[in-house]
Amino acid sequence: MSETHTSDETEARDQLLAIAEQFYDQFADGDIPRMSLPTRSKSNIEYDEDADVWVYGDSQSTRSANSVRGARKLLKSVYTVDFLAQQLDEGRSSTLRELYYLSESWDEAEAQFNDQSESDKLVEDLEIVSGVKREDFHMRPEESGAKVMGPLRLREQTRRGDREIHCQEDVGQGGYQIPNNPDTIDFLDTDADFVLCVETGGMRDRLVENGFDDDYNAIVVHLGGQPARATRRLTKRLHDELDLPVTVFTDGDPWSYRIYGSVAYGSIKSAHLSEYLATPQAQFIGIRPQDIVDYDLPTDPLSDSDVNALESELEDPRFQSDFWTEQIGLQLDIDKKAEQQALASRGLDFVTDTYLPERLAEMGVL
């Protein structure tokens, strides 16, 4: 293990234990133990002009042992801190799912989690309070399955040492699988001109089969729906370190616009990591509501939940630009949505021969 990683792990352990020590000091001073966190809501995110990302605002909520509910949350925090510190001492790691089940073995029933969403949220809370990423706690999610295909040579750390991989020549049709912690990757060289993030596996496979990555020197990143943190981190590194334009290609519905938003602006629940995960320069290719009209794409009508989501996005500060106001307004007017693969109504090659080249040229990428 490198010195850098040892230093990161030491800092992670120290910051975790500092949380428990804070509770102890509050007890010793005769104070009720408490922990303050930023309010994680749409109304408490603000634009950081220096970093060009959306971050939490000044609104805070306090978790206090003054109530039974608050005391339980602090108890769970202490048990989780103890587990994570021990995990770091032993040089081991675990998944978020395993943490949920591991709590079943804790000797205090009140410290056990009711479901995984509760333990996941607590890990996020500990990230915020400690200022340390969960990857440095040695916590990882389940495999996202997201993959990369394109003219990129990299070096990754494995249990058997470092190995070099070319993300076209050394992989099958599936591509190179993004590791849980992409900061363990070193970029060696690339012939790529841009990055294309693709929402669906079906469209990603179409682009690869049609040779889009070869023909246009593109690094195709499969987002796999709502992108995992590792996928967003790798995308940001491709932009920041290799100076590659990043584009995002999704379905044409409000949920897919949020997928783009998580890549470009960051998500509300991980706004504390926006500078680490978000790529504010990322551009949205489509499917745009304007594309639905221009290409007369096969569509489905908007559901009530779609309409509510679109109206919510109009109030979301991350989508309050002229482009999004116009496109969302148009979608509400036409009352339609379309999938990426609806482009196949014009032939299997239309997306790679016509749609993407034309849109990328319009955006100044090609």
Curated annotation (Swiss-Prot):
Gene Ontology CC: one annotated term: chromosome
GO molecular function, one term: DNA binding
Record-linked InterPro entries: Spo11/TopoVI_A (IPR002815), Spo11/TopoVI_A_N (IPR013049), Spo11/TopoVI_A_sf (IPR036078), Topo_VI_alpha (IPR049333), TopoVI_A (IPR004085), TOPRIM_Topo6A/Spo11 (IPR034136), WH-like_DNA-bd_sf (IPR036388)
Alphabetical keyword list: ATP-binding, DNA-binding, Isomerase, Magnesium, Metal-binding, Nucleotide-binding, Topoisomerase
Cofactor(s) named in the record: Mg(2+)
Top EC class of this enzyme: isomerase
Catalytic activity, reaction form: ATP-dependent breakage, passage and rejoining of double-stranded DNA
Residues annotated for Mg(2+) binding in this entry: 199, 251
Disulfide feature: none
UniProt cross-references to CDD domains, sorted A to Z: TOPRIM_TopoIIB_SPO
SUPFAM superfamilies the record matches: DNA topoisomerase IV, alpha subunit
Active site: 101 (o-(5'-phospho-dna)-tyrosine intermediate)
Keyword Metal-binding: yes
EC number annotated for this UniProt entry: 5.6.2.2
Family matches, as Gene3D superfamilies: 3.40.1360.10, Winged helix-like DNA-binding domain superfamily/Winged helix DNA-binding domain (1.10.10.10)
Subunit structure: Homodimer. Heterotetramer of two Top6A and two Top6B chains.
Protein name per UniProt: Type 2 DNA topoisomerase 6 subunit A
Organism of origin: Halobacterium salinarum (strain ATCC 700922 / JCM 11081 / NRC-1)
Gene designation per UniProt: top6A
